[in-house]
Amino acid sequence: MSSVGPLEDEAAGTELGGSPADPATLTEIDPSAIQVRKTRTVVKLDCERLVSKKGLPYLLKNAPKHARISKRRDTYGNLCHVLQFYQLWAHELYPKAKFKDFVALCDRLGKTDRQLRAYRMQLIREELGLAAEGLDPPPQPLREHTGAGGSQPAGSVAQDTNTNADLSDDDLLYTTSRAAAASSTANPVPRSETPAALAGVDEAELLAQLAEMQRAAEEDVHESEDDEQLALMREMDEFM
């Protein structure tokens, strides 16, 4: 049995009409050439993404409709329904992070980003009716609170101001809501007050008014539920 060498293979290929492999025709790879790779775009959760069409505007538009509390479900079922809506929204907006991390990022951005804080105050003004008139409440100096015994010392006023400055918007909202409720009980505000009369309030008073409105809405909901339960009990008594 005879072995065929490389020279004989090349000669046989030439006789069959083929051409031997030319080293010059082979593509040579330059080791010094720089290979440019396309980098993936890193998606970050920032103020621009939160105020985009799929961000907070989508949440404000669809949350009252899709995250509605139903009387047919129990408390646990309603909580799961609301939580599922927010989880789907968070995954659609920023799928890279888990829901718990997404909430932490939103909380941090809400306390540090100035544009996001301004957007939030704009929403509060729109809900209170100040933005409809195109009014922007100007900053006011500190007002001395007088009680039955006379004027309050200046040191205590400065201490209260420093305490409120250290609080975030969320903390200030719940801190000032009780004081606003007590003041509204002592000195009720007339219903004929127009949005133009509210133009001189600061951010703390805006947050307090918003908290008072939310508390009144919750009380109305509870009263309506109690009335419906009483009506059902009366119907049951009639049948019995």
UniProtKB/Swiss-Prot annotation:
Major localization class: nucleus
Q: Which InterPro entries match?
A: Csm3 (IPR012923), TIPIN/Csm3/Swi3 (IPR040038)
Disordered, as annotated region: 1-28, 132-169, 213-240
Q: An example of a Gene Ontology BP annotation on this entry?
A: replication fork processing
| The organism's place on the tree of life at top rank | Eukaryota
Q: Can you list the GO cellular component terms from the UniProt entry?
A: replication fork protection complex
Q: What name does UniProt use for this protein?
A: Chromosome segregation in meiosis protein 3
